[in-house]
């Protein structure tokens, strides 16, 4: 079954590439833009004396326009820890400048793409917030409006979804909803405020809300975010997570293999138990070696994580290496 899925993916992308190459200058539509991410890594846990190699992500995507105001997006994951997944399958209509309506499987407007997208993450491993709060995609309807207010770029998003996992369109008596408002853009200051109601089943109902702030300069960036997840079924399983991270890119000579070097540092924590101690926190140091002129793109990365535990969390203790100090060497290609 996986082989068939893989072959189908290559056939679809091959057909799109052939169609694109066959266009003439007078044919503007349909248009195609391809993107991809490949992440291979090695991990070593000194305390346990164990190590592993893995292909963490292998993504291929295509997006473009069918007509002047009609967009599409498709993306597949060839290997997410060995699993094939369809990630994005959506169409968008843009009847007015800045306004879009999207239907299909797409991202939920609650997480920041720079903490969930393998191609834009600052470290090999995601923040606690991005990894353990819930899925990042669902099937549904999303509307977004980009506008300027007082010369500040802003956007407002609202979506309703199946309140389920991706690639599983089930009948529901309750749908989930998410809303987000953003101030600024990815260069300079940017801040967002968001809420997400997720009534998955009688046993699982989460309500999330949070805010973030980031600043990106020419060759550096700093990001911070806090989010609460209320458990509407079990009050003793509420979660609160936070992170603060930053990186700086130093240019090297163009004739070097590595075009820049990027030190990075992150502190994050996640807390569930209602006491005066943080359950699990982590300090991560990273050093990236850029393969291209563009900072924070394709690179060879070396990270080391230190974990500090006051209470065991079940979802962070599924195997010994999960919450143990860890060395990671990762090769990331972004195209």
How does the language model describe each region?
Residues 286-311:
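C-terminal closing repeat unit and adjoining cap/tail of repeat-based domains
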Residues 147-151, 215-219, 250, 291-295, ...:
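A generic beta-sheet turn/junction motif
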Residues 1-26:
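Cleavable N-terminal export/targeting peptides
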Residues 41-47, 69, 77-81, 110, ...:
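Sequence/structural signature of outer-membrane beta-barrel proteins
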Residues 27, 182-273, 281-282, 333:
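Detector for outer-membrane/organellar transmembrane beta-barrel domains
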Residues 24-165, 173-175, 181-191, 243-247, ...:
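Outer membrane beta-barrel
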Residues 181, 246, 321-335:
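Outer-membrane beta-barrel "beta-signal"
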